[in-house]
Amino acid sequence: EDSGTEPSMNFLFDNSHFTDIEAAEGGCYLITNGLGGYSCLDLAGGTSRNDHAIFMAAVKAPNVRYNMITNLLIDMTVDGIIYHLSTQRMADDSFTDNFKYIEKVCFDSNMFSMVFNVRNVRLELCIVMPHGENTLMLNYHISNPECHDVELRLTPLLRFTPKNTAMKADAEFSIREYATDKADAKFPIREYAVAKQLLNSTNNEKMNGGTRDSSDVNCCEEFPANAIIIEGNDLRVVCASNMDVELLSQNSLYSMRWTLDTRDGRDDTGSCVINHCLKKRTSEPDCENVIVYSLCAPEDILSRVQNDIVNAFNKAAADEKARIADIVNHSGLKSELGRQLAAGADAYIVERESTGGKTIIAGYPFFEDWGRDTMIALGGTTLATARYSDCRSILKTFAKYEKNGLLPNLFPEGGMTPMYNSADAPLLFVNAVYE
């Protein structure tokens, strides 16, 4: 089959799907990065599980995962009227029903998009995760044919906790603007603290009607930052954007209820920290606002986005679309179902850092790469899709740790001994080799 043929894997839901909050929470998208990290929210863009996050990073592939950015709240002002576009159930079980503004959502080629329509101003959010790295790229594209006065305001919900772990109430975060050391740097050197320093009594006195000189950066300080560093819980995220950054006067908590966890008997409430927002005001007919979050080195990210961050997003999206198309076409599968299998299976084939080989995640968001499940899944994920080199790598990964005729059913992280508690795994291993 022609390798240039694009697979048909478009899942589209229009506004008729979003009839109530239950429908809004009734499905989710999944974007993966090949490391075990992912982006997963419900179809209306909210969280209905503790393990939902717009940016879940795998700090050690594939199982040491951290909920970095749970979500970004979306507010759009049109001619002075504020429209809250995010849909989320709150800790007191109240909820925002802003799914009514959704025109459509679409999942295609490991990317997700959703379109809001407010008074003929369309806001399209597109999400992509470049393969093989802990990076999330977001494009908030404003189409404004009638040239309304529009302000887009995005509020990140910071978590920085291990997956499925509650954030501590006293969690501290800091923000500083990234600075290059080049003489012609576009990123001036400035430091901003928004943790204890921001909340001390002296600063509070200044914010509550006292005098305030130009050196204070505590009360809704704005700066045209092209890149900031967000730090918390001994982790650091680079945020690059063509939007302006506004620091809030103090950290605040945003509390949520996760109804799918209520159903399953898990802890169903939790909080995130809010300490800044990103915003853009425009009356242009077309405006693209890109945000990049990454655990990569700041200089690596900025080398890609510094000159044209919109083009960097478009390239990442095109690269991911081409990667999925190559996987599907290489599989040789002709039916729509078979091609869907080839595309979908890619989400579960990930790197294992400890062995330097491939492995298979048993499922998102809960499961890890278990030996028995991996051997069961080999046929459908690798053999049926002609991913023979990946199959070979996975078999070698597990064979390396053979012990007394058994294969590891679990690779505990942190140098611990693998668990050998599955008699099925070696039998399924032999079957996979035979096939």
Residue positions per predicted region:
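Acidic, mature catalytic/reactive cores of soluble proteins
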Residues: E1-E435
